A protein has these predicted regions:
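Short, membrane-interfacial amphipathic segments enriched in basic
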Residues: 1-14
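Transmembrane alpha-helical interface segments in multi-pass membrane proteins
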Residues: 12, 17, 21, 25, ...
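Generic structural signal for small/hydrophobic residues in well-ordered secondary structure
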Residues: 23, 51, 69, 99, ...
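Hydrophobic, regular-secondary-structure patches
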Residues: 49-133, 140-143, 175-176, 227-228, ...
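Transmembrane helix-loop junction
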Residues: 53, 175-176, 363, 367, ...
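Mid-to-C-terminal secondary-structure elements
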Residues: 123, 132-159, 163-267
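Peri-transmembrane interface segments
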Residues: 252-255, 266-300
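Short cytosolic juxtamembrane segments of multi-pass membrane proteins
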Residues: 404-419
């Protein structure tokens, strides 16, 4: 009995694909909507998966036991920032010192000021780098954020105390200015109209939010030096709080309590600053990807609906064209279930072919994006491929039911007489 059923299933599949091959152009036009729907889902999924992988790597490089304190909301977010946030008072290095002193679960606190200058270029000889990200940091910043040096040293307490004109630069900065010269440590550069000496170069960092890690474009200087170079442009301070091993939740609560008291926040008021951890930043990004994913699903659903309606229409046309064939099969003993099965398999084979084409195109597009836009990470997840193919089969099953039932309901006598 089992071999007979297996043979019947193979015959049904063979007939389905023979029908598709006999009407190749019509079949291709019919599944276009399915192709687009699957293509959109898989491509968007691949981009979001690649971006998530990179942001997890970048955040975890800074340390999974670190807390990031800032007066504005941090982490990836959709939409414009609330303007009320810009009225908040920035944090100060003294706030970090208080957290370190008063929070028992905090091991160390570093601070970093972002230097917002019109001219961010740094020059050496005839070379100039204009994409530098300028930050004035404490001497312990490298230890707290797990930064590694390729050569030279990091900034010291003495550099900060004496406001020395020294810099530590990222991988991209060093390659642009000193690539042909080899070593960068000890060389003089000009920045903000002043001479500075490079004392260290950072190791190349792993991928960031859009592929490239911004730390590769970094230029660090001592915090007090930064206050001289840009006295008004260095007010925004980020505190990086390192919790003791296994005490991150306690450190988070203690740091929040200390900062709320220092900033005069009442018990019934929300905090006028933001505390983030690696897990929170990843959760924020996951929320964004979920929203983008819903939009992609909505777009692909429209395409799949259009494709499904097209499949249903073409299958109804096929029922009309093959009325006599259906009559012959019924006269030879085919049951209603056999006719339903045949037309359902044809509909699912049609939409599955569209799903396969959509997946193959999506893989090609993802690889092309990696070549043309390296900063836009793309990694096709296996679940997206499986989901795309499964949905395409489901579309054929749903929209093939009516034509299949209509074919099965034909009277064999009337079908044989159909012209």
């Amino acid at each position: 009995m089992a071999p007979a059923r297996s043979g019947l299933a193979l015959d049904t599949l063979r007939m389905a694909f023979d029908t598709l091959r006999a009407h190749r152009l019509r079949s291709a036009l019919t599944v276009f909507g399915v192709v687009i729907g699957v293509l959109v889902v898989v491509v968007v999924s691949s981009i979001l998966t690649g971006m998530r992988r990179n942001i997890v790597q970048a955040v975890e490089e800074y340390g999974t036991s670190n807390i990031f304190a800032f007066h504005l909301t941090t982490g990836p977010q959709l939409g414009p920032r609330d303007r009320a946030e810009f009225r908040r008072k920035p944090l100060r290095p003294e706030d970090g010192a208080a957290v370190k002193e008063l929070a028992p679960s905090v091991e160390d606190v570093a601070h970093c000021a972002f230097l917002w200058l019109d001219d961010r270029s740094i020059a050496h000889g005839g070379e100039k780098y204009s994409r530098a990200s300028l930050q004035a940091v404490s001497a312990n910043y490298a230890d707290v954020t797990n930064l590694s040096l390729r050569e030279g040293r990091f900034l010291t307490e003495s550099d900060d105390e004496h406001r020395r004109p020294v810099l530590v630069v990222g991988h991209n900065v060093a390659e642009a200015l000193f690539g042909a010269l080899g070593s960068a440590a000890g060389r003089e550069v000009r920045f903000a109209g002043r001479p500075f000496r490079v004392v260290g170069v950072l190791e190349k960092r792993k991928g960031g939010f859009m592929g490239e890690n911004e730390d590769d474009n970094i230029v660090f200087m001592p915090y007090r030096t930064g206050r001289i170079v840009a006295p008004r442009a260095s007010d925004w301070v980020l505190l990086v709080i390192r919790a003791r091993s296994g005490e991150l939740p306690l450190a988070l609560d203690q740091a929040e309590d200390v900062l709320r008291r220092r900033r005069g926040v009442r018990a019934n008021e929300p905090s006028n600053f933001d505390l983030s951890t690696a897990d929170r930043i990843i959760q924020q990004f996951d929320g964004i990807t979920a929203a983008i994913g819903l939009v992609a699903i909505a777009i692909s659903s429209v395409s799949l609906l259009v494709g499904g309606i097209g499949v249903m229409n073409i299958m109804l046309v096929s029922v009309t064209e093959r009325t006599q064939e259906i009559g012959v099969r019924k006269a030879l003993g085919a049951r209603r279930g056999d006719i339903v099965r045949q037309f359902l398999v044809e509909a699912m084979a049609l939409t599955l072919s569209g799903g396969v084409i959509g997946v193959l195109l999506a893989i090609g597009v993802s690889r092309l994006l990696l070549v043309l836009l390296p900063a836009l990470p793309s990694q096709v997840p296996p679940w997206a491929v499986v989901a795309g193919l499964t949905v395409s089969i489901g579309v054929g099953l749903v929209f093939g039911v009516w034509p299949a039932r209509r074919a099965a309901a034909l009277d064999p006598v009337e079908a044989l007489r159909y012209e």
